[in-house]
Amino acid sequence: MPKMKTKSSAKKRFKITATGKVKAAAAGKRHGMIKRTNKFIRDARGTMVLAEPDGRKVIKNYLPNGL
């Protein structure tokens, strides 16, 4: 059976740390920021580490060979 390919969209959206955790950008930042709190805007900057079950799903389904 051939090797499963890494999804191109996942390559652009996720990074795997040295310890195997998955980093991604925070959601909800595209538009409508005027009604968000300053704390939400501040916390949404940069990247965040996904929860362990979500990270496992991303690696299994979208990044089978890592990055």
UniProtKB/Swiss-Prot annotation:
Keywords of this entry: Ribonucleoprotein, Ribosomal protein
A molecular function (GO) term: structural constituent of ribosome
InterPro entries hit by this protein: Ribosomal_bL35, Ribosomal_bL35-like, Ribosomal_bL35_CS, Ribosomal_bL35_sf
This protein's record includes keyword Ribosomal protein: yes
Disulfide bonds: none
One biological process term in Gene Ontology: translation
One GO term describing the cellular component: cytosolic large ribosomal subunit
PANTHER family documented for this protein: 54S RIBOSOMAL PROTEIN BL35M (PTHR33343), LARGE RIBOSOMAL SUBUNIT PROTEIN BL35M (PTHR33343:SF1)
HAMAP family the UniProt entry points to: Ribosomal_bL35
Entry's family note: Belongs to the bacterial ribosomal protein bL35 family.
Protein name: Large ribosomal subunit protein bL35
